[in-house]
Amino acid sequence: MTRVPRGYIARRRRTKMRSFASNFRGAHLRLNRMITQQVRRAFVSSHRDRGRQKRDFRRLWITRINAATRVYNVFNSYSKLIHNLSKKELILNRKMLAQVAVLNPNNLYTISNKIRTIN
């Protein structure tokens, strides 16, 4: 069987994969088969973790809001705060509430007073 010399297309594909693997170490940086496997695995992980990151941040914000509401006696729990916010139709997302709870807890009191006074 005759040997088929690969053209520039295969070389271009490998150099593209190498550019993705530029920060890897050892055989993962040097061997083409290992490079393709590790780059594919890295892409799978990054795709999975983009969705996971959204869940993790939401959990972090909820934890921060819950801790602040209990420490500063704004409400008894996070769920009561969110329930009253939605009932009074105040539109504050969890990210904003967490920032307020961490950086300026006094504003959390003003938000809770708004919830209690609006009828």
UniProtKB/Swiss-Prot annotation:
Function, please? Binds directly to 23S ribosomal RNA and is necessary for the in vitro assembly process of the 50S ribosomal subunit. It is not involved in the protein synthesizing functions of that subunit.
Q: Which Gene Ontology terms of cellular component type are present? A: chloroplast; ribonucleoprotein complex; ribosome
* Name listed for the protein in its UniProt record: Large ribosomal subunit protein bL20c
Q: Which GO terms describe its molecular function?
A: rRNA binding; structural constituent of ribosome
One GO BP annotation is:
ribosomal large subunit assembly
| Family matches, as HAMAP family | Ribosomal_bL20 (MF_00382)
Q: Which family does it belong to?
A: Belongs to the bacterial ribosomal protein bL20 family.
Instruction: List, alphabetically, the PROSITE patterns matched.
Output: RIBOSOMAL_L20
The keyword Calcium appears for this protein: no
| UniProt superkingdom | Eukaryota
Question: Which Gene3D superfamilies does the protein's record reference?
Answer: 6.10.160.10, Ribosomal protein L20
**Pfam families assigned to the protein according to its UniProt record, in alphabetical order:** Ribosomal_L20 (PF00453)
The stretch of residues making up the signal peptide is none
UniProt keywords, alphabetically: Chloroplast, Plastid, Ribonucleoprotein, Ribosomal protein, RNA-binding, rRNA-binding
Cellular localisation: Plastid, Chloroplast
What is the first-listed, main subcellular location in coarse terms?
A: plastid
